[in-house]
Amino acid sequence: MNIAKFCIRHKVTTLLAVIMIAVFGVVYTTQLQMALLPNIEYPAAYVYCYYNGAGPEDIEQLVTRPLESAIMSVPGVDSVTSSSADSISTIQIMYVENTDVDIAATKLREKFDALSLPDGCGSPVILNINVSEMMPSAIVGLLGDDLAALQQQAENVVAPALERIDGVASVSVSGGVERQITVTLDAQRAAGYGLSTSYITQILQAENLLYPAGEVYNGSQKLSVTTDAQLSTVDEVANINIPLQTGGTVRLGEVANVAFETSDRDAIAAMDGTPGIILQVSKRSGANEVKTAEAVVAAMEELAAKDGSIHYAIPYVASEYINVAVDAALEGIILGVVLAALVVWLFLRRGGATMTIAVSMPVCILAVFVLMYVCDLTLNMMSLGGIAMGVGMIVDNSIIVLENIYRWASEGHDRMTSCIEGTKEVTLSLTASTLTTVAVFLPLGLTGGIAGQIFKDFCLTIAFLILGSLAVAVTLVPLLCYFLLDESKVHLDALQRAQKGGRRTQKLMDWYVKKLDYYVHHLKRGVLVSVALVAVFLAACLNTKMVLLPEMDEGMVTVTVSMPIGSKVEQAAAMAERVAAIAEETIPELAGYYYTADSGQSASLVLNLTDKGERDRSATDIANALRDATYDVAGCEITCSAYDMGAMMGGSGVSVNITGEDYTTLKMIADDLTAQIAAIPGAVDVSSTVAEQVPQVKVTADRQACSQYGLTAYSVAAAVRSGLTGTTATTVTIDNKEVDVVVRGDGRAEESLDALRSMAISTPTGGSVPLGSIADVSVVMSPQTITRYNQSRQVTISGDAADGDTSAMAKSIRAILAGYTLPGGYTAELAGGYTEMMENFSDLGLALIVSVGLVYFVLASQFESFVMPVIIMMILPIAFAGALFALPLTGKDLSMISLVSLIMLAGTVVNASIVLVDYIKQRRDRGETREEAILHACPLRIRPVLMTTLTTILALVPTALGMTGKMNEMMSDMGTTMIAGMLVSTVITLLFTPVYYCVIDDLTHRRERRKAKKLAAAQSEP
């Protein structure tokens, strides 16, 4: 069936269908969810388990090892990496590809429930990783000096209000202090009564309860019975009578100081030097991030208006960045449409033709929005980037149909014939070129790992665009031409242009025909020239560095301050303030900062910079300058880097994992390799997870001595823990908020080792005994942190390259590892962001190979020939080499984005060759010789080839130059490589595709002649 003929004869039906698609497109565009990134589910999870007061070795033995054993028994687990530090075990789980992390988490909980972890150890917390949800929708800072009041304000007012917002999943609070009822025992008085912290803890638990007792009948009515003995005030806690072993009781307040006070600070936060509390708001999966972030801002404004005591600042809100990205993409799309219409006007000089293109492109784009809504895609950087990248491509099909219709009209054919036959003549080549372009996105969309998830939306939107462009080209374009085409005027204008403009264009056409004729008759030289071009282009790309994703200047610099073991949280916060002061002095582009110190061992500082257009330096340059400025700061380790999205998806540095059992040997190997890696030119932030041996007090109970006093090793350990750390005995509800009741010693035992040895340990008989009499109290050396990989101890060395060239750094590290002799049973291998990058590059390389194979399959099916696709695809090596040549020329790096552009080129640059070769074949079928067909067909196909190439290139120029905002920092590499590849391929197509055609044709005929000779010889034999 002739589609163009059907559409022209059913004008009303066709127009109503187009209008309906446009209306649905406008409606669904407003209903699409908006997000910064596609939903990226990383097949990984974290497990956290807290055991306050336990050292790294105790955590490893009592918590980490049992958890690891349980985790390794869950199906789908690929690897387990753990870190055992003071009071906490952190375990990272990597699943095999396509594992359902939610089901895996359920199985993990079942395994954990069956474990017997130590008393006082918290329940393991499982956190599945979703990259898009790791970035907060908003960060809110509550400011003020009274941190306890701020904590209550955050927990009772602000956080609940924000959590009620539709789309908010959670609100985390850090930097405040909790209120608690503290029961501090007087050691001497308690010992005089024979009281211990553990005994008082038991009494408090027994005296504070709400206990169901059963049911009674009141006549015919059945009533439930509850024993209510809940504590509700500090005085009630202080007035509890403690039974004595010798008989009688003593009031708790007589042997302990009972007070309502703030807990010890375990986190400190500040914003621009003002103390406060940081609230991080995370969106729910599938929620509209822009609406969620804007609702957070509106909610804070409403809360501040109602309560004048709420003082806040919002240093980060995702909607601002997303709106900029969306606006940038829409600007690029509109600019692409305008430029495409301009190209049509310049070549055809017809208002009707320009109007046809100007109408067909928006219809195609609106149709894509309908399909995005149906497929549940979001408006994110990748989907919008796909539309922006595809704007220049979608007009190609329409231009070829339009140009061919006008060519038929210029030759004197009537309007109906021109529209129907002009469309029919190019339908086969259009279908082939469209299918080849779509085919390359199939393996890309099915690629595993992060690359596949990142580019899935990108691939789908471009595939929708290109398929839609084919439908529009063979339906709407001929119909609009039928309405707008004046065939007699087109024919007359063609004759006039031939007379007036012939002299202006004839010289260029004569030059082209002369070169074409030369290469067609000197095939070897043509092949040598094309091979030389490939060699030159590839040689220029040898020093191009590789990165996972292009650098995106998001206007933030992150600083991590690592403190020595034993440091207090106040010391970490003070060091963060010092670094912030240095930043204020040395960074004029600084707009503000905030930091959080979550423990005494580290603090995280985030510097917000002014807008990119207002500064001369990039965020990376500023981070490097700050690294130099803080180099001499003593007492801590400081790392500075620009906030990078790529780091969230695997990092950008290089790591070396060293595994073995003996920690001393691991430390020796790590120290040697760390020194050698740090000496690599350009290596920065080189460090290892080797924890310095730090002093630790070890209490070893003497079981025989303990038994003489009726004590056990456990009762001694519990008494020491309660005296030093304190024990949460129970909770009391005050002002509708649960408050912990913590029983602890008076702090004297913490003052020195002698004081610890003198700690009175209560005995079951009512007396007490010094700790030193029943246990050995000594100082031993222990590692600060113990890291394990797949149940073996591991040390990791990590570093980065100052210029970002991790591939060169990895090459140097490989040389170091090759020359290093490891003891038996120990291994050292590359890991980190570099290996993640290479895995993704490998996946994309495989996708490129599969894409080329699919292009061949589609072309072979369309032309029913094994040879024709080879001729057309001879353009690919030169296009790839030319595209890569543009990277060092423009100072860009080879990234995943660049490789994706090569895959796109595999399906786009062949389009011009398809049009050219198909028309050469048609003319040969009409009886022309090979050379005649080439010299007649190529000049006639210059105009559509140049028009499609120019529209695609011009539509990509804003993206390549980053003219439309921050989003194009990521897509700029793709635009650059696409433009270079298309420029090179267009020139080569017009000059050398006929050469390849002749070479393959000669080889085919030569093979046929040999077969004929063999057949004739066989038949002539008697």
Describe every region a protein language model picked out:
Residues 5-12, 29, 285-290, 323-380, ...:
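Interfacial segments of transmembrane alpha-helices in multi-pass membrane proteins
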Residues 318, 384, 632-1004, 1022:
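C-terminal transmembrane helical bundles of large multi-pass transporters
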Residues 12, 19-55, 113-120, 165, ...:
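Transmembrane helices with small-residue packing motifs
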Residues 322, 326, 402, 407-435, ...:
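Helix-loop junctions and hydrophobic alpha-helical segments within the transmembrane domains
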Residues 391-405, 426-446, 453-498, 605, ...:
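Transmembrane alpha-helices and their membrane-interface boundaries in multi-pass membrane transporters
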Residues 530-629, 633, 637-640:
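Juxtamembrane segments of multi-pass membrane proteins
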Residues 1-334, 453, 655, 737, ...:
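Membrane-proximal extracytoplasmic
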Residues 1-34, 424-426, 497-550, 607, ...:
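Signature of alpha-helical transmembrane segments and their immediate interfacial
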